[in-house]
Regions:
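Structural signature of tandem alpha-helical TPR/SEL1-like repeats
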Residues: 1, 23-31, 53-58, 67-77, ...
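A conserved position within tetratricopeptide repeats
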Residues: 3-4, 30-37, 60, 82, ...
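Short coil turns that delineate tetratricopeptide repeat
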Residues: 7-8, 37-40, 85-86, 118-119, ...
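Alpha-helical protein-protein interaction modules
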Residues: 41, 78, 156, 185-197, ...
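Alpha-helical adaptor scaffolds
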Residues: 65-67, 120-132, 156-164, 175-176
Length: 205
């Protein structure tokens, strides 16, 4: 354990645990994961290996921020969790696995089924990036901004969405409001200038 000190230690533990599981050493896989710093994916794996309801409940309230699963081996783990509890987190993480493998249709189907339940802005940004329907895409970008109005990337995503669809007044409204709350932020000021130019407000730009 003391030898695993890199910044991706969680992945090292998970990789080793999955290897043990693949050769039928479930107990050793569980032991490895019990020593891991852990994240949401690890939490679901621990619940899956032990078939423990209490561990599943803990996984269902874990933080999924900066968790990006990509392993095919995790697919049955998340599918099991979805069947057992139906929490949106397991569906979201499963969608990310599909997304990482360019299975966009499968990812979008999973995300659509979660509706408006998730209170996690990146969920809506991810779904918007896959959603072909303009109305639904706009709703997801707006939901992300509503959930985390301090994060500049979400305000920028909504602004760029409006600009792509030539809704320049809406784009300007979004980025102007955000720029008043985040002054002297170079990416925001740059996007504000672009929005002003798109609205032919050259003097203000």
């Amino acid at each position: 354990q003391s030898l695993i000190r890199n910044e991706m230690a969680v992945q090292n533990y998970l990789e080793l645990a999955i290897w043990y599981y693949s050769i039928g050493q479930v107990g050793r896989a569980e032991k490895v994961l019990s020593m891991s710093p852990g994240d949401a994916e690890t939490a679901y794996w621990r619940a899956y290996l032990s078939q423990d309801r209490e561990l599943l409940e803990k996984a269902d309230v874990s933080d999924v921020s900066f968790v990006f699963p990509f392993r095919e081996e995790s697919v049955p783990v998340f599918e099991w969790a979805m069947k057992e509890s139906g929490n949106w987190r397991s569906a979201y993480l499963l969608a990310l696995v599909h997304y990482s493998r360019n299975n966009d249709a499968e990812a979008l189907e999973l995300l659509r089924k979660q509706g408006r339940e998730p209170d996690f802005a990146p969920f809506y940004i991810t779904r918007a990036s896959l959603e072909p329907d303009k109305t639904l895409q706009e709703a997801d970008y707006r939901r992300a901004v509503a959930l985390d109005g301090a994060e500049w990337r979400y305000a920028h995503a909504l602004t760029r969405f409006y600009m792509r669809h030539s809704e320049n007044r809406k784009a300007l409204s979004v980025i102007e409001e955000f720029s008043r709350r985040k002054r002297n932020h170079f990416p925001t000021e740059t996007l504000l200038v672009r929005a002003l130019i798109c609205n032919e407000e050259y003097g203000a730009a």
